Every structure is written in C-alpha cells, then in structure tokens.
C-alpha cells in the first residue's frame, strides 16, 4: 500500500516540487494552516514525501513528532484515497475572475507597489476573486501565496522601475489559507472571496503567519483551489492554481512612485485622512477647527505678551466659551471645543499652557463677563476636579502685564473667576447693601478657613515690604501685595504630623470640603506659638527659596498646595462651631480673607522698602478704611472686603511691630539663608 500512496503523493506535489522543491514545503502549510496542531514547524520540504515510518533521518526535535503522527498520516493517506475515489466522478470546472480588475489594471500600468512593514501591512487593492463552476455539495479549501516573479532586484530611478541586480535569497514560503476554509462550493460561489486580511511583512522571524517578502523585489500572488474537506489533507490534495498577471507588485518599505501613492489615496477608503477634500469626519473636523485654531493661536499670543486691552481678550473669549454658550453659536467652535473641554480640564499641570483655552470653556457658562451667577456649593464643587487648573476669565486678563509665568497667571485666574461669581450671587441674594468692585479682584490660590490670631496690622506687615512690587508679585495689578492667609499662621504643633493625603485632597478640593467640616478640627484651639516655624516654610517658598515643605516628601506642585491646605487642619469641625469665628470678621465662613498664597518659587531678592501701609495694600486691609460692615456674608476677594478696622484686635502700629519681630525671628530660625537675613534687616522700621 505504500507504493501507491507514495506515488500519489509525489504526483500531487509534482507541479510544485519537481523543478523547485521549496515551493510548497510542509512547513508552509503548517505555519499558515493550524500551527496549534503542529508545534514543530521545521519539517524539511520533502519530509512527508518519503514513506512515513522511515524516521532515520529525522532530527531530535522531530523524533517525538513522527511517532505520534505516523499512524495519523497513514490513516490520512488511506482516507484521502478513499474519499477522492467517489468524488473524482463528480466533475467540476472552476472559473475564477478577478474582482476590481480595472483598478488592478490602473496600478499595473504604473507599476504596483505594496508596502511591507515589520508589524505586517495589508495589500491594497485587496486580492479578491469570484468563483464559479464549483460543486455545490463538495468542500473546498481556498489558499493564496505570493511567489517571486523573477530573480531580479529593482530600484526606482528616473520615475521608473529598473533592474538593480540579482535577487536576494528567497524568504520562506508561506501559504495563506482563507479563514472560511473549508466550505462548500455553494458558499464559496455565493459572494466574492476576499483575502483582505493577508499581511505582508519583512520580518524574517515573524510568528504571526504573515507573508515574508524582500523589499524592492517583484512578486506574483497566486490563488489556489483545493478540493478537500480537511486542512490536514492539503499536502495530499491536488491544487488548482490561478495567476493574474495584473496583480504582480514590487514590495517596498515606502512608496516610490507618487502616482501610485495618489492612486491608493484616491481609492482606499482607509486613506481618506490623506485626501485634500473628503467627506470623512476627519476632513470635516480639520475644516471646522481652522478658525478655532487661529483663535487659539491669537489667544496664546495674548497670554504671552500680557496684553491688557479689551479687544485682545474679548474676541478669543467668545471662541473659547462658545462650546458652553447658551445662545446659538457657529458650529465650528461648538464642534471643536465642546467635545474636549472635560477631557482637557483633567490633564496634568504640565499642560496648562497649551490647554488654557479649552479649560476655560468648562467653567465659564457664557462668553460675557457678566455671566450667570452660580451658588457657592456649585462653584466649589466644580473647583474640586480642577483645583490646580486655570480659568481664562477675560476681566482677569485685562491687566496681566506682569513678568510672572503664564502658568501662575492662569492658576490665579481660576480662583478669581470662581470667587467673583460667588461674590455676585451673594450680593444679589443676601447682602444687597454692600457694593464692591466687580472688575478689580485679586486671585486666590488656596482658600482656607483657619481661625486667625492676627489683626489688621499683622496682615499689613505680612505684606512683606518688598513684595508689594506690582511688577513681580502682583500679576493682576489690583492693588494687593503678596499676602499670607491668616490661617496659615495659626496651626497647632501637630498640624504637620497629621499631614498626609487628606491635606492633598483638601488642597485640591478647595474650600468646599472645608466648609462642610470634612477635615478634622485638630487646630481649633491653637495659639500663634507654632507661627514662626510654619510661616517660615510658606514665606520662604513664596520668596523663591527652594525649601520643600514637609521635609521634601512631595514634589514642588504639592508642597505649596498642601502647605495652605495644612493650615486648614486648624479649621473647626464645622464653620459654625468656633466662637472666634463670630468675634473676628475675618474668620466667619463667608467673609474669610482671600489672601493670595503665591506658590511659584521665583529667585528674586526682596528689595529694601519701607512702604507697608499705603503702597499696594487692599482696602480691606488698610486700617483707614472704615466704610465696611463686619460679619458680612460676602465671599469676595480681598479688595471687595470692607471689614471695619475698628473691630480688629490691637492697634495697627503695635501689631505691626510684633509681627515684624516675628518675621525676623523666622529668618533667624532658618539655617543657611544669610542673604535673607541681610535683606530682612531693614524691616525694623516699616512705618
């Protein structure tokens, strides 16, 4: 029985193995067909043309494979003969026609190129054929392979392909079996058979079954029909091979002929993004975003130059806020901004400069400065996810002629905008008698509600005589110098020890969580005793001295945020439990001072200046301003506070001297800061 089987097998392989024995090695079938059935894919090309039981020449790796499969293959030989005998009586005459022949002809005239990549690239046009004349009941396996068209290597020179030399050694052959195989003739003839999932690669060690080709070589795809009901019978079945000359191509790693590139762009539905005019979403998005991109670039220019004209900030504002404008807006701006606001506003602080415009839209309901008012809970609820972001409120940009970085300016704007809206709503609902300037407000970095033990003089002296320079430390020129929040000086000794992620959350969530008493009130009864050490940390960070708070546990962005939030640990469990809140107008939950805690470390030496009382002090801190109401429910920035100076503890001059002495003690406590001591000595006479 072996002789007929051997003969039949040899005849089945005759068209493929006689003159080129490596055309269809067994490994090609196994790698392409079902590698899970055959873990060892290194069979020699003629291994299965010998009698199966003869394993004398088999290697050690194949020794375990052949005994296990020998009986299976012998049975397969017998089954193939028995199954083919009755089927031979049924005559079929398959007719194969190439789909998209006109397109193939266009490519063929120019010289078809197919890109090969290491990860595998599909062919375009895809190899697609229509079959007729199959036996409807019989099962067929359809395959495809790609063979070298000649023994030449090519190069593209002077707009045409020419022979550049002899071909490189051929890559291992691989058959691509159609994933629907085996299927009945009726199924194959029902629709065109597409091999669109076939991928070409130049990775010699490819493990995915892709067809491996050499770049700059010409190849010819071939289509095979095998009448068999099992893929395991492929090596012992007769192949019908069909070749379409117009499908030959040259494998390239990048397109050489621009005409081929354009032809592929024009006809490949997946290349719409490269077209100049297209109907795809990508093209529409590109067209619609052009005006928005121009506005964005203009706005970036405005931010960098620090322009303070209304015209420079009003027009881009409408573009940025159009995505959230209640009125009808042009579709390009709505399309560009609306879908990205929520995403970009959650990005990290490092992308603030580039995403200034997008984040602005998510927190401003209308492009006009007089935007609809929002309640405090809604405002601070919205501040939680973007506490470290910025807002681009146009009013706060009008006077941005500082040399602060854009990032500092934008972060200040966020708090300014939210507090201004809260201001306006409070004025309308609860305290209509209080009049404040809407347009001049000072930004606040972190809002805390710690009880303060300092009066107006303390706060004035804490303006740090040299820091009232509006060029360096007052980016918005609203008349307020660099100030510290009074709550940052009233921390209990255990405030730092309890500092963990809770204070990071507090710093991120703003003051909304603090009002609800979500943080522990560990510093309720605290005294100013820890003031020198704690203030030194905050003050040094603001003066540009790179001294990390909390011993450098967290990086730069966290130290100043958590420093202000740590002061919030001295806050009572609820904003109504501490009696000091009712006594001091600065400490009620609604009228707490909005003193800006400047986070950015600028290496700027503090100039010697003695003007502390008049220059740059906000009206709310000036002891001469008596036109205010105490205990007002106004939650506005410091310039809007009109708290009476008569109700503050102590006289301004005496408290100023005390705080100045404390400031000098702070300077002495810090080691290695001789330069700071020299600059702090003139502060003894701030009057």
Swiss-Prot record:
<dbReference type="GO" id="GO:0072019">
    <property type="term" value="P:proximal convoluted tubule development"/>
</dbReference>
<keyword id="KW-0217">Developmental protein</keyword>
<dbReference type="GO" id="GO:0046549">
    <property type="term" value="P:retinal cone cell development"/>
</dbReference>
<keyword id="KW-0804">Transcription</keyword>
<dbReference type="GO" id="GO:0046551">
    <property type="term" value="P:retinal cone cell fate commitment"/>
</dbReference>
<feature type="compositionally biased region" description="Polar residues">
    <location>
        <begin position="611"/>
        <end position="630"/>
    </location>
</feature>
<keyword id="KW-0539">Nucleus</keyword>
<dbReference type="GO" id="GO:0060219">
    <property type="term" value="P:camera-type eye photoreceptor cell differentiation"/>
</dbReference>
<dbReference type="GO" id="GO:0043704">
    <property type="term" value="P:photoreceptor cell fate specification"/>
</dbReference>
<dbReference type="GO" id="GO:0030903">
    <property type="term" value="P:notochord development"/>
</dbReference>
<dbReference type="InterPro" id="IPR022582">
    <property type="entry name" value="TBX2/3_TAD"/>
</dbReference>
<dbReference type="GO" id="GO:0001702">
    <property type="term" value="P:gastrulation with mouth forming second"/>
</dbReference>
<dbReference type="GO" id="GO:0006357">
    <property type="term" value="P:regulation of transcription by RNA polymerase II"/>
</dbReference>
<dbReference type="GO" id="GO:0072068">
    <property type="term" value="P:late distal convoluted tubule development"/>
</dbReference>
<dbReference type="GO" id="GO:0035050">
    <property type="term" value="P:embryonic heart tube development"/>
</dbReference>
<comment type="subunit">
    <text>Binds DNA as a monomer.</text>
</comment>
<dbReference type="GO" id="GO:0035777">
    <property type="term" value="P:pronephric distal tubule development"/>
</dbReference>
<dbReference type="GO" id="GO:0003205">
    <property type="term" value="P:cardiac chamber development"/>
</dbReference>
<dbReference type="GO" id="GO:0000978">
    <property type="term" value="F:RNA polymerase II cis-regulatory region sequence-specific DNA binding"/>
</dbReference>
<dbReference type="GO" id="GO:0042461">
    <property type="term" value="P:photoreceptor cell development"/>
</dbReference>
<feature type="compositionally biased region" description="Basic and acidic residues">
    <location>
        <begin position="408"/>
        <end position="430"/>
    </location>
</feature>
<dbReference type="GO" id="GO:0048793">
    <property type="term" value="P:pronephros development"/>
</dbReference>
<feature type="coiled-coil region">
    <location>
        <begin position="654"/>
        <end position="681"/>
    </location>
</feature>
<feature type="compositionally biased region" description="Basic and acidic residues">
    <location>
        <begin position="675"/>
        <end position="687"/>
    </location>
</feature>
<dbReference type="GO" id="GO:0021538">
    <property type="term" value="P:epithalamus development"/>
</dbReference>
<dbReference type="GO" id="GO:0036302">
    <property type="term" value="P:atrioventricular canal development"/>
</dbReference>
<dbReference type="GO" id="GO:0021982">
    <property type="term" value="P:pineal gland development"/>
</dbReference>
<dbReference type="GO" id="GO:0008016">
    <property type="term" value="P:regulation of heart contraction"/>
</dbReference>
<dbReference type="GO" id="GO:0048318">
    <property type="term" value="P:axial mesoderm development"/>
</dbReference>
<dbReference type="GO" id="GO:0042671">
    <property type="term" value="P:retinal cone cell fate determination"/>
</dbReference>
<dbReference type="GO" id="GO:0007155">
    <property type="term" value="P:cell adhesion"/>
</dbReference>
<dbReference type="GO" id="GO:0000785">
    <property type="term" value="C:chromatin"/>
</dbReference>
<dbReference type="GO" id="GO:0046548">
    <property type="term" value="P:retinal rod cell development"/>
</dbReference>
<dbReference type="GO" id="GO:0048663">
    <property type="term" value="P:neuron fate commitment"/>
</dbReference>
<feature type="compositionally biased region" description="Basic and acidic residues">
    <location>
        <begin position="375"/>
        <end position="400"/>
    </location>
</feature>
<dbReference type="GO" id="GO:0030509">
    <property type="term" value="P:BMP signaling pathway"/>
</dbReference>
<feature type="region of interest" description="Disordered">
    <location>
        <begin position="303"/>
        <end position="452"/>
    </location>
</feature>
<dbReference type="GO" id="GO:0045893">
    <property type="term" value="P:positive regulation of DNA-templated transcription"/>
</dbReference>
<feature type="region of interest" description="Disordered">
    <location>
        <begin position="611"/>
        <end position="687"/>
    </location>
</feature>
<feature type="compositionally biased region" description="Polar residues">
    <location>
        <begin position="431"/>
        <end position="451"/>
    </location>
</feature>
<dbReference type="Pfam" id="PF12598">
    <property type="entry name" value="TBX2-3_TAD"/>
</dbReference>
<dbReference type="Pfam" id="PF20627">
    <property type="entry name" value="TBX2-3_RD"/>
</dbReference>
